[in-house]
Amino acid sequence: MGDIIKIKENREFQRIYRKGRYAVSRALAMYMLPNYSQVNRIGITASKKYGKSVKRNRIKRLIKENYRAIQDNLKIGYDFVIVARKTDGSVEPDFNTIHKELNYLAKKLNILVR
């Protein structure tokens, strides 16, 4: 279990959005694109539509921790962008909900090893 390598540049996000595959769940969207290296990289976003900065940063922290928990079960050599989606209810997704949705998206994109 290594460190998380982040995607930081806007052009890399745009390349993954344009050329990558994606899957959507209720609270998250995951985009993926092969990077042909021996590591996975991740970018996490939450638009201003999601809420104020406190709310956006909290959901990004939850996504990051859940990704850290499942990263050993993912195939190697991909760039991922995970987008927090605004839910229709007033209830914010909790740790377990995000964990279930990340696993669902990984299965849908066929990137789970186990």
Predicted features along the sequence, with ranges:
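Positively charged, solvent-exposed patches that mediate nucleic-acid binding
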Residues: 1-114
